[in-house]
Structures are given as C-alpha cells and as structure tokens.
C-alpha cells in the first residue's frame, strides 16, 4: 500500500463557515475557530458540545497537553471519523484529534515545539481547531498542567 493511504482526500466543504468555540482551563480562556479542512471531525465534535474532560501533559510529544479518550470513537451519523487534514507537526495553538488505531483516541493541543507521538512512534491527528485568541496564554496553561497535573478543560460553542 505504501504512501497511497496518505494521499489527500476530496473534502466535503458544504459548510465551510468557521464556528468559534470558547475553551476554558486553569482559569484561562481561549477562543478557537474550526478548520474547514476537517469537516467530518468538526461536525462530529460540535455535536458533543459543551464538552468537559481532563487535560494532562503529553509524555512523548514535547510541549503540548492532551485529553486521553481511551477507546472512544468520535462518530458522525454513526460512522467513526477517520483521518482528514492530519499532521504530526501542530503549530502553537493547533488542536488535533487522533481517532485511535496505534494508540488511544485523544485530543492534543500544542503550546510550544511539538511532534505528535506515542510510545509506538510518530502519530498524525486531524487539525480541526485553531486558537485565534489567547494564544499568548497557552504556555501558562502548559506549565500549570505539567507541574500541577490533570486539569478540567471545557469546549463550548460561542
């Protein structure tokens, strides 16, 4: 199969309007916009809102925080979300959804240099949200989670 499975797919951009979300954690507030290049991930995630979980510091990926989701399957009309607009190199403020497979399902948010990985090796996640306001506070969040442990994080539509 080689790299054929990694070739770009045709995107369904019927609704490319970006939705804004408020993300709160550790007393900090961030505003994120959905990414039109990940329509299936965005549509399925928006159905979960408001969404609260625990966020912890990454173990293998560098400067990032993640929401471990175990065997959870993000679904869109009963179909599990697969890979779309996926990357291993999130920029500061990028939020990725990893649908599982080699490692557990998760959401990862970069606050500094980050290469998305697990003990199994490099991973790629769907870039579905980008923080557009409050990005300068991400390092504060990351350091707090690193030194103080798991924190609540909430995603809600504005």
Regions found by a protein language model. Give the residues of each.
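N-terminal intrinsically disordered, low-complexity, charge/repeat-rich segments that act as generic
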Residues: 11-37
